[in-house]
């Protein structure tokens, strides 16, 4: 099932038809199929090899596999997943015109966030557009991941290299189940400068 906020806001970032869309720390998200169905070429990046296998198994697709340095490239049609460390991926391996982050940056502790921004910047061409979905909650109420990523921190981390626009913030209903007093999700449009 596709993420509701992706379906609602993808058109807002105005990604070019056929754009190569980067999906960092993609796991086995079905959102990649949805983006592919919109006419995009998808490049996911995932550290856990089992998640890559599960993605293609669930899609009932057998990918071509090729070793590229420290990464393995799994390709089936317009979908590619590079299995390996996002932070060691060379820029030319995933040069993208658009990107989608539903759970990547919130999976990282605060000490790794600037490195993440730097790597996204290096993997995207100037003018690239991104859609990022974050979570915010009182961090002391839950260890994470997902970690809390307040809107102000997103702006501070990206502002020097991206034009940042907050598209929407929604109150999530499952905060009580997680033992949280409040849980929000924000959607950002980011344009690489």
Annotate each predicted stretch with a short phrase.
Residues 107-119:
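A short, conserved alpha-helix within the catalytic core of class I
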Residues 32, 42, 99:
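Conserved catalytic-core segments centered on acid/base and nucleophilic motifs
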Residues 1-18, 28-31, 44-91, 117-119, ...:
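Class I (Rossmann-like) S-adenosyl-L-methionine-dependent methyltransferase catalytic domain
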